[in-house]
């Protein structure tokens, strides 16, 4: 599958007046005009570097640590709500943004994102994308009498949407081109910000197979917008062993607000199962076994959930009698306040510390970070999508069968959808009520 990347930087004035103009801009780097309805793509001079999977180690570790921090903050906002987010999408968008940061802003971004080696992180993110690309496979065994098409599709897309006739640093464009495969789409926010918004949303809609049709709401772009970074992730994967839908039954689920009825899928299979202090976990593989869905559930609602590495480290093969609810949930949120609380405040201040992006004055800073994600889990497998926009603004063998472990997921649970080769958490979340649909 061809990998497309897309990075977009927009200003969102509709959110807490974060989008205010820094002043008049004068283009000093020649970016040819492009209408928002038919944007012109400008690539950096550097060719895309082919990274290898081993480059992904640092990126994977950083994303998983960032994921744990962010998960805790997001759950605390509304402990009884369903939650899904993509730490990979958010980290990719913010790491691309950090490529243009300097000074305290860069230091804080690296700390929050758990980037310990800034000099190599962009190559590592490139390697992570290469690892994700490698899981894309489709096999149709219908002709051989099999069940049909087995598929894993995982696409990562990034790009940059910039104001035409505005100065952007060549080194910044080259880095995004070589490590992220990202070109800049030139639009004209000054004369038609709404057309730019429509174009960006159309791109996200296409990349996510219509699962996220409107990342940016009405009025989110203004004449003061100069640049918007956008990442989009789409995933569709069949289970290695599909659930028999004839065995799906309406069963009780203990949600925070009281008992609800969930459509519970059932199977008995050899799975990776583990236990810890007050919690149990099971890992359900997708076809080809490159990706997995890891579920952790507490013995009671007040038990602290393990970190993903702790849960994964406790796993061992067991025969499991599994009950897992079908669910279809989504989350749409601004991450600005959360990221500030996590220690990334300088990036949201008018400090002129994104000079790696542009030498234009007044300088740019982050106005907002918008994230949407959704996930659908059923008998066949999983379909999920996520998108993140970082909005830059101006100052403005045959043997005796063992006794199966019974694991019925009938109360709130945490999940991680992981790339098994790198351990990277692609999607994570918390299901408190599987009967609530998006």
Regions found by a protein language model. Give the residues of each.
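Bacterial N-terminal signal peptides that target proteins for export
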Residues: 1-5
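Detector for small/aliphatic-rich hydrophobic stretches
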Residues: 6-18, 22-189, 420, 437
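Structural recognition of the beta-strand scaffold that forms the well-ordered cores
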Residues: 92, 294-295, 416, 427
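Extracytoplasmic/secreted cell-surface and envelope-processing proteins
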Residues: 104-109, 303, 331-333, 424-428, ...
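Short Gly/aromatic-enriched secondary-structure transition segments
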Residues: 109-113, 243-250, 302-311
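Non-catalytic, conformational "gating/processing" segments within enzyme and secreted inhibitor domains
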Residues: 118-297, 313-400
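C-terminal soluble interaction/assembly domains
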Residues: 379-438
């Amino acid at each position: 599958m061809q990998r497309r990347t897309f990075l977009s930087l927009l200003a969102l004035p509709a959110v807490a007046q974060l989008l205010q103009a820094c002043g008049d801009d004068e283009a000093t780097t020649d970016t040819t005009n492009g209408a928002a309805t038919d944007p012109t793509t400008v690539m950096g001079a550097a060719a895309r570097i082919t990274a290898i999977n081993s480059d992904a180690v640092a990126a994977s570790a950083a994303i998983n640590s960032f994921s744990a921090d962010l998960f805790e903050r997001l759950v605390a906002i509304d402990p009884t709500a369903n939650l899904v987010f993509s730490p990979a999408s958010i980290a990719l968008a913010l790491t691309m943004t950090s490529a243009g940061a300097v000074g305290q802003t860069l230091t804080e971004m690296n700390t929050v994102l758990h980037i310990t080696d800034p000099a190599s992180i962009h190559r590592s993110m490139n390697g992570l994308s290469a690892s994700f690309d490698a899981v894309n496979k489709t096999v149709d065994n219908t002709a051989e009498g099999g069940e049909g098409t087995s598929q894993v599709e995982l696409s990562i897309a990034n790009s940059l949407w910039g104001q035409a006739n505005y100065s952007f640093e060549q080194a910044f464009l080259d880095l995004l081109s070589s490590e992220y495969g990202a070109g800049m789409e030139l639009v004209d926010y000054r004369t038609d910000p709404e057309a730019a918004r429509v174009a960006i949303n159309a791109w996200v809609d296409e990349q996510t197979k219509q699962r996220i049709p409107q990342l940016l709401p009405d009025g989110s772009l203004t004449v003061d917008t100069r640049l918007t970074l956008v990442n989009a992730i789409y995933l569709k994967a069949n289970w290695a062993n599909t659930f028999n839908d004839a065995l799906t039954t309406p069963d009780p689920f203990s949600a925070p607000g009281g008992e609800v009825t969930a459509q519970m899928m059932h199977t008995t299979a050899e799975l990776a199962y583990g236990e810890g202090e007050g919690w149990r976990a099971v890992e359900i593989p997708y076809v080809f076994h490159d990706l997995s869905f890891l579920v952790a559930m507490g013995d009671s609602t007040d038990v602290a959930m393990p970190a993903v590495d702790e849960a994964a480290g406790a796993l061992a093969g067991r025969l499991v009698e599994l009950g897992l609810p079908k669910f279809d949930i989504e989350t749409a949120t601004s991450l600005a306040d959360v990221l500030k609380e996590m220690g990334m405040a300088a990036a949201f201040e008018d400090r002129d510390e994104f000079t790696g992006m542009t030498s234009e004055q007044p300088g740019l800073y982050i106005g907002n970070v918008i994230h949407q994600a959704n996930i659908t889990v059923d008998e066949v497998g999983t379909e999920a999508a996520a998108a993140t926009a970082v909005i830059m603004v101006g100052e403005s063998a045959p043997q005796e069968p063992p006794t199966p472990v019974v694991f019925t997921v009938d109360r709130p649970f945490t999940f991680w959808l992981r790339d098994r080769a790198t351990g990277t958490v692609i999607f994570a979340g918390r299901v408190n009520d599987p009967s609530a649909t998006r």
